[in-house]
Amino acid sequence: REQILKIHASNKPLEENVDIRKIAERTPGFSGADLENLLNEAAIFTARKNKKIITMEELLPSIEKVILGPERKSRVISDKEKKITAYHEAGHALVGHLLPNTDPVHKISIIPRGRAGGYTMSLPSEDKYFHSKSEFIDELAMMLGGYAAEEIFFGDITTGPSSDLQRATKTARNIVTRYGMSDKLGPRTFGKKEEMIFLGKEMAEEKDYSEETAKSIDDEISALVEEALKTAKKIITEKKPVMEKVVAALLEKETLEKEAFEDLLV
Protein backbone atom coordinates (compact mmCIF):
# COMPACT_ATOMS: atom_id res chain seq x y z
CA ARG A 1 0.00 0.00 0.00
CA GLU A 2 2.88 2.33 0.80
CA GLN A 3 4.27 1.90 -2.73
CA ILE A 4 0.84 2.42 -4.33
CA LEU A 5 0.33 5.59 -2.27
CA LYS A 6 3.74 6.89 -3.38
CA ILE A 7 2.79 6.35 -7.03
CA HIS A 8 -0.56 8.18 -6.67
CA ALA A 9 1.06 10.93 -4.56
CA SER A 10 3.81 11.63 -7.10
CA ASN A 11 1.66 14.17 -8.99
CA LYS A 12 0.17 15.78 -5.85
CA PRO A 13 1.66 18.63 -3.77
CA LEU A 14 2.33 16.82 -0.48
CA GLU A 15 3.98 18.53 2.47
CA GLU A 16 7.50 17.22 3.06
CA ASN A 17 6.75 15.74 6.48
CA VAL A 18 3.67 13.77 5.33
CA ASP A 19 4.07 10.25 6.72
CA ILE A 20 3.07 7.94 3.84
CA ARG A 21 3.86 4.90 5.98
CA LYS A 22 1.39 6.04 8.65
CA ILE A 23 -1.30 6.45 6.00
CA ALA A 24 -0.50 2.94 4.69
CA GLU A 25 -0.80 1.54 8.24
CA ARG A 26 -4.21 3.18 8.67
CA THR A 27 -5.62 1.74 5.45
CA PRO A 28 -5.69 -2.07 5.84
CA GLY A 29 -7.85 -3.70 3.18
CA PHE A 30 -7.77 -0.65 0.88
CA SER A 31 -7.53 -1.44 -2.83
CA GLY A 32 -5.42 0.61 -5.25
CA ALA A 33 -8.60 2.46 -6.27
CA ASP A 34 -9.42 3.23 -2.61
CA LEU A 35 -5.92 4.65 -2.07
CA GLU A 36 -6.22 6.81 -5.19
CA ASN A 37 -9.64 7.99 -3.99
CA LEU A 38 -8.14 8.83 -0.58
CA LEU A 39 -5.52 11.12 -2.12
CA ASN A 40 -8.13 12.75 -4.36
CA GLU A 41 -10.34 13.43 -1.31
CA ALA A 42 -7.35 14.96 0.50
CA ALA A 43 -6.72 17.22 -2.52
CA ILE A 44 -10.39 18.34 -2.42
CA PHE A 45 -10.17 19.07 1.35
CA THR A 46 -7.00 21.10 0.69
CA ALA A 47 -8.61 23.13 -2.11
CA ARG A 48 -11.66 23.88 0.08
CA LYS A 49 -9.33 25.38 2.69
CA ASN A 50 -7.66 27.50 -0.02
CA LYS A 51 -4.39 25.73 0.67
CA LYS A 52 -1.84 24.68 -1.92
CA ILE A 53 -0.09 21.87 -0.03
CA ILE A 54 -1.70 18.60 1.21
CA THR A 55 -0.83 17.83 4.86
CA MET A 56 -1.68 15.04 7.34
CA GLU A 57 -4.53 17.32 8.47
CA GLU A 58 -6.28 16.60 5.16
CA LEU A 59 -5.10 13.01 4.68
CA LEU A 60 -6.35 11.50 7.96
CA PRO A 61 -10.00 12.69 7.63
CA SER A 62 -9.92 11.45 4.02
CA ILE A 63 -9.34 7.89 5.27
CA GLU A 64 -12.54 8.08 7.31
CA LYS A 65 -14.47 9.55 4.39
CA VAL A 66 -13.45 6.63 2.14
CA ILE A 67 -14.32 4.06 4.86
CA LEU A 68 -17.46 5.60 6.37
CA GLY A 69 -18.76 8.27 4.01
CA PRO A 70 -18.90 12.06 4.50
CA GLU A 71 -19.44 13.81 7.83
CA ARG A 72 -23.02 14.99 8.25
CA LYS A 73 -22.49 17.98 10.52
CA SER A 74 -25.69 19.54 9.16
CA ARG A 75 -27.76 16.75 10.70
CA VAL A 76 -29.47 18.12 13.80
CA ILE A 77 -29.13 15.78 16.77
CA SER A 78 -30.91 16.26 20.08
CA ASP A 79 -28.85 16.38 23.28
CA LYS A 80 -30.39 13.08 24.34
CA GLU A 81 -29.36 11.32 21.10
CA LYS A 82 -25.89 12.81 21.35
CA LYS A 83 -25.57 11.45 24.89
CA ILE A 84 -26.75 7.98 23.85
CA THR A 85 -24.26 8.00 20.95
CA ALA A 86 -21.44 9.00 23.32
CA TYR A 87 -22.18 6.10 25.70
CA HIS A 88 -22.61 3.74 22.74
CA GLU A 89 -19.23 4.60 21.18
CA ALA A 90 -17.47 4.71 24.56
CA GLY A 91 -18.79 1.18 25.13
CA HIS A 92 -17.26 -0.08 21.88
CA ALA A 93 -13.96 1.66 22.59
CA LEU A 94 -13.57 0.59 26.21
CA VAL A 95 -14.42 -3.07 25.58
CA GLY A 96 -12.14 -3.10 22.53
CA HIS A 97 -9.28 -1.50 24.44
CA LEU A 98 -9.45 -3.84 27.43
CA LEU A 99 -9.68 -7.15 25.58
CA PRO A 100 -6.33 -8.66 24.52
CA ASN A 101 -7.22 -9.86 21.01
CA THR A 102 -8.77 -6.79 19.36
CA ASP A 103 -7.18 -4.17 17.11
CA PRO A 104 -6.07 -0.93 18.83
CA VAL A 105 -8.66 1.87 19.01
CA HIS A 106 -7.42 4.80 16.91
CA LYS A 107 -10.35 7.19 17.04
CA ILE A 108 -13.80 7.67 18.57
CA SER A 109 -16.29 10.19 17.23
CA ILE A 110 -19.91 11.16 17.85
CA ILE A 111 -20.11 13.20 14.63
CA PRO A 112 -22.55 11.46 12.25
CA ARG A 113 -20.79 10.06 9.19
CA GLY A 114 -22.40 8.18 6.32
CA ARG A 115 -25.31 6.27 7.87
CA ALA A 116 -23.68 6.01 11.31
CA GLY A 117 -24.53 8.28 14.26
CA GLY A 118 -20.94 7.95 15.47
CA TYR A 119 -18.04 5.54 15.06
CA THR A 120 -15.13 3.86 16.78
CA MET A 121 -12.18 3.20 14.50
CA SER A 122 -9.94 0.23 15.27
CA LEU A 123 -6.97 -0.61 13.08
CA PRO A 124 -4.59 -3.59 13.13
CA SER A 125 -0.97 -2.92 14.09
CA GLU A 126 0.12 -4.97 11.08
CA ASP A 127 -1.44 -6.60 8.02
CA LYS A 128 -3.17 -9.86 8.96
CA TYR A 129 -3.94 -12.75 6.66
CA PHE A 130 -5.23 -15.15 9.32
CA HIS A 131 -7.82 -14.67 12.03
CA SER A 132 -7.85 -16.72 15.23
CA LYS A 133 -10.90 -17.86 17.18
CA SER A 134 -9.81 -15.80 20.21
CA GLU A 135 -9.71 -12.69 17.98
CA PHE A 136 -13.23 -13.37 16.70
CA ILE A 137 -14.51 -13.89 20.27
CA ASP A 138 -13.04 -10.59 21.52
CA GLU A 139 -14.22 -8.73 18.41
CA LEU A 140 -17.76 -10.00 19.05
CA ALA A 141 -17.65 -8.49 22.55
CA MET A 142 -16.38 -5.19 21.14
CA MET A 143 -19.15 -5.14 18.51
CA LEU A 144 -21.70 -5.50 21.32
CA GLY A 145 -20.07 -2.86 23.55
CA GLY A 146 -22.48 -0.20 22.28
CA TYR A 147 -25.56 -2.36 22.93
CA ALA A 148 -24.26 -3.23 26.42
CA ALA A 149 -23.58 0.43 27.26
CA GLU A 150 -27.08 1.53 26.22
CA GLU A 151 -28.67 -1.18 28.33
CA ILE A 152 -26.50 -0.48 31.40
CA PHE A 153 -26.72 3.34 31.41
CA PHE A 154 -30.23 3.90 29.99
CA GLY A 155 -32.04 0.65 30.81
CA ASP A 156 -33.26 0.68 27.21
CA ILE A 157 -32.06 -0.13 23.68
CA THR A 158 -32.30 2.11 20.62
CA THR A 159 -32.06 1.23 16.93
CA GLY A 160 -28.42 2.43 17.08
CA PRO A 161 -26.89 -1.03 17.57
CA SER A 162 -28.82 -2.67 14.69
CA SER A 163 -25.80 -2.75 12.34
CA ASP A 164 -23.61 -3.98 15.23
CA LEU A 165 -26.05 -6.85 15.80
CA GLN A 166 -26.01 -7.74 12.09
CA ARG A 167 -22.20 -7.81 12.08
CA ALA A 168 -22.04 -9.81 15.32
CA THR A 169 -24.58 -12.36 14.06
CA LYS A 170 -22.72 -12.72 10.75
CA THR A 171 -19.37 -13.14 12.56
CA ALA A 172 -20.83 -15.75 14.93
CA ARG A 173 -22.38 -17.60 11.97
CA ASN A 174 -19.01 -17.64 10.19
CA ILE A 175 -17.27 -18.96 13.32
CA VAL A 176 -19.71 -21.89 13.34
CA THR A 177 -20.42 -22.58 9.66
CA ARG A 178 -17.34 -21.40 7.71
CA TYR A 179 -14.34 -21.74 9.98
CA GLY A 180 -15.13 -24.93 11.91
CA MET A 181 -14.44 -23.19 15.25
CA SER A 182 -17.49 -24.41 17.16
CA ASP A 183 -16.67 -26.67 20.13
CA LYS A 184 -20.12 -28.25 19.91
CA LEU A 185 -20.29 -28.87 16.14
CA GLY A 186 -16.63 -29.53 15.54
CA PRO A 187 -14.16 -28.88 12.72
CA ARG A 188 -16.39 -28.88 9.67
CA THR A 189 -18.25 -26.40 7.49
CA PHE A 190 -21.99 -26.15 6.90
CA GLY A 191 -23.73 -24.98 3.74
CA LYS A 192 -22.05 -25.09 0.33
CA LYS A 193 -21.83 -21.57 -1.03
CA GLU A 194 -21.84 -21.11 -4.79
CA GLU A 195 -21.48 -17.90 -6.77
CA MET A 196 -24.43 -17.31 -9.07
CA ILE A 197 -22.75 -15.32 -11.82
CA PHE A 198 -26.00 -14.41 -13.58
CA LEU A 199 -27.25 -12.78 -10.36
CA GLY A 200 -24.22 -10.53 -10.14
CA LYS A 201 -22.13 -12.87 -7.97
CA GLU A 202 -24.86 -13.28 -5.39
CA MET A 203 -24.09 -16.25 -3.16
CA ALA A 204 -26.45 -19.19 -3.24
CA GLU A 205 -26.23 -21.60 -0.34
CA GLU A 206 -26.93 -25.28 -0.73
CA LYS A 207 -28.06 -26.69 2.60
CA ASP A 208 -26.00 -29.82 3.23
CA TYR A 209 -27.22 -30.52 6.76
CA SER A 210 -30.34 -31.70 8.60
CA GLU A 211 -33.00 -29.62 10.39
CA GLU A 212 -31.61 -30.91 13.68
CA THR A 213 -28.15 -29.59 12.76
CA ALA A 214 -29.72 -26.28 11.63
CA LYS A 215 -31.13 -25.89 15.14
CA SER A 216 -27.72 -26.68 16.66
CA ILE A 217 -26.14 -24.02 14.41
CA ASP A 218 -28.73 -21.45 15.54
CA ASP A 219 -28.15 -22.39 19.18
CA GLU A 220 -24.38 -22.01 18.80
CA ILE A 221 -24.72 -18.62 17.10
CA SER A 222 -27.01 -17.40 19.90
CA ALA A 223 -24.63 -18.76 22.56
CA LEU A 224 -21.63 -16.95 21.02
CA VAL A 225 -23.50 -13.63 20.79
CA GLU A 226 -24.93 -13.95 24.32
CA GLU A 227 -21.51 -14.80 25.79
CA ALA A 228 -19.98 -11.81 23.99
CA LEU A 229 -22.69 -9.51 25.36
CA LYS A 230 -22.05 -10.88 28.86
CA THR A 231 -18.32 -10.09 28.48
CA ALA A 232 -19.06 -6.55 27.26
CA LYS A 233 -21.49 -5.89 30.12
CA LYS A 234 -19.01 -7.16 32.72
CA ILE A 235 -16.24 -4.85 31.46
CA ILE A 236 -18.50 -1.79 31.25
CA THR A 237 -20.06 -2.42 34.67
CA GLU A 238 -16.63 -2.77 36.29
CA LYS A 239 -15.31 0.36 34.53
CA LYS A 240 -18.27 2.73 34.98
CA PRO A 241 -16.13 5.66 36.26
CA VAL A 242 -13.83 5.36 33.22
CA MET A 243 -16.86 5.21 30.91
CA GLU A 244 -18.16 8.45 32.43
CA LYS A 245 -14.78 10.14 31.77
CA VAL A 246 -14.73 9.02 28.13
CA VAL A 247 -18.36 10.09 27.62
CA ALA A 248 -17.73 13.54 29.15
CA ALA A 249 -14.71 14.04 26.87
CA LEU A 250 -16.72 12.94 23.80
CA LEU A 251 -19.60 15.28 24.61
CA GLU A 252 -17.14 18.15 24.99
CA LYS A 253 -14.83 17.47 22.03
CA GLU A 254 -16.97 15.20 19.79
CA THR A 255 -13.84 13.35 18.63
CA LEU A 256 -11.05 11.60 20.55
CA GLU A 257 -7.82 10.43 18.92
CA LYS A 258 -5.96 7.37 20.24
CA GLU A 259 -3.65 9.28 22.63
CA ALA A 260 -6.45 11.40 24.15
CA PHE A 261 -8.60 8.29 24.66
CA GLU A 262 -5.79 6.32 26.31
CA ASP A 263 -4.94 9.25 28.62
CA LEU A 264 -8.46 9.00 30.07
CA LEU A 265 -7.94 5.35 30.99
CA VAL A 266 -5.00 5.97 33.33
PLM features: what roles do these ranges have?
Residues 1-2, 25, 52, 57-61, ...:
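Generic detector of short, locally flexible boundary/turn motifs and exposed helical patches
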Residues 74-84:
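Short pre-active-site segment immediately N-terminal to the catalytic Zn-binding motif
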